[in-house]
Amino acid sequence: MRNLRAAAPASFLAPPAPPLLLPPSTPTPRGAFSAKASPAAAAAQAHGWCPSPRRVGRLRRRAGAASSSVASVEDAKKDVLVALSQIIDPDFGTDIVSCGFVKDLEISEALEEVSFRLELTTPACPIKDMFEEKANEVVAALPWVKKVNVTMSAQPARPAYAGELPEGLQKISNIIAVSSCKGGVGKSTVAVNLAYTLAGMGARVGIFDADVFGPSLPTMVSPENRLLVMNPESRSILPTEYLGVKMVSFGFAGQGRAIMRGPMVSGVINQLLTTTDWGELDYLVIDMPPGTGDIHLTLCQVAPLTAAVIVTTPQKLAFIDVAKGVRMFSKLKVPCVAVVENMCYFDADGKRFYPFGQGSGAQVVQQFGIPHLFDLPIRPTLSASGDTGIPEVVADPQGDVAKTFQNLGVCVVQQCAKIRQQVSTAVSYDRSIRAIRVKVPDSDEEFLLHPATVRRNDRSAQSVDEWTGEQKVQYGDIPEDIEPEEIRPMGNYAVSITWPDGFSQIAPYDQLEMLERLVDVPRATTAAVSS
């Protein structure tokens, strides 16, 4: 995985707040695990933080300074919650008690045994074992505790607006679109392997093949039941299943029409998606068809897409089409959280070759501010797995391709959790002072930008030649008094700004941080209005 920003910890488990979770003064190099280290400790150490004798000693000294007993159950519960509040979730930036993860806290009558449940945001948390180990450690350090019982669970699958959704979608927590406007770049390969990666991480997963004209799912997986069945009582479609993953495709509907007009196709997609009895799912992965047509609009109108994963190849033509897709998702208010560059390279004779060139995926990341980029090699087994009906991550779960998809799965899990917890827009326009207010995510910093400065620094192909870097839009082309008409967030990495001339600009947060800031702020003329 290539990350063009500082990498965030690959899980929902963060190094708890100082001083408890400070790493040792001489940390063990990454990958240099002790032979006696537990898998959870090894995973933590791989991320640069782990249980250390020094920290355990601090815990014991702290425990020795405290009372060896508590007066009541309520006092005991307070002690436990204070101890657990030392564990910080990196994505939400607060402790697990404030996040509401601690459930069913019970103290025995003898005030010696503690039981509680940690309810994570998703069962696919990549190092949930480390979370459990950390909770055991901090509670066991309390001087009056003799036994700790920790149970791990996940929040029930429920979208934010379940009551407003079709019945079939009301129990799905996250809907992920895997998309590329260009055909033949490997969307279906990425969608299927991502789905089985998430399932392998412990999530309940479904796949929806939204390509009516060329469904790929019946070829890429081989379920025993290859026909969709309708429940005669509820009139809902029962999805077929393979290795624990539910799936629906027009290819499983039997012999149907081969030629359909646009409205008919949209109706078929709507029916297949919304009348299917998906049950409770943590993630529904949608394999989007190529293009930016009626089907895409139908899907975004019917299903509340949580995020999109963009698939591309190194060729320039693929980049041009993918850029259209990213802008489509911007207008439909769907954040793009990762780019997968497929068929990127192959290794031979100890060397790495790039037969289709380099840079297309990186250009998408840089131009649109998408924080994560993943490279997939040209590999015969990856192609063959799509023909044999067994996904590559299932056939070779320890291989290099599976490791790349594991990193992609961690990214998707992490970004979806952040998106679902968003409570406010990070960027707004203050009409009273004619300035754009920017509050960077995960930071208390707020600053002001001149709207014309933001517009002049657009990185898109309309403003800058993506191959030569030549500026197309000149300084004088943008009036000083230009004002944005609308500002809306694109996940955790960028905002989409609509200008009076109809231009839609995608402005990554890291770009906004580097722009010249307003110092002499004009006096307010009217009441401030947030976009």
From Swiss-Prot:
One of its GO terms (molecular function) is ATP binding. Residues 17-37 are annotated as: Disordered. One of its GO terms (biological process) is iron-sulfur cluster assembly. It is found in: Plastid, Chloroplast stroma. Coiled coil: none annotated. Residues 1-62 form a transit peptide. PROSITE patterns: MRP (PS01215). Its cofactor is [4Fe-4S] cluster. One of its GO terms (cellular component) is chloroplast stroma. Residues 17-27 have a biased composition (Pro residues). Keywords: ATP-binding, Chloroplast, Iron, Iron-sulfur, Metal-binding, Nucleotide-binding, Plastid, Transit peptide. Binds 1 [4Fe-4S] cluster. Required for photosystem I (PSI) biosynthesis and assembly. May serve as a chloroplast scaffold protein that specifically assembles iron-sulfur (4Fe-4S) clusters and transfers them to the chloroplast PSI and ferredoxin-thioredoxin (FTR) complexes. Probably not required for assembly or stability of plastidic 2Fe-2S clusters. This is Fe-S cluster assembly factor HCF101, chloroplastic. The lineage of its organism: Eukaryota, Viridiplantae, Streptophyta, Embryophyta, Tracheophyta.
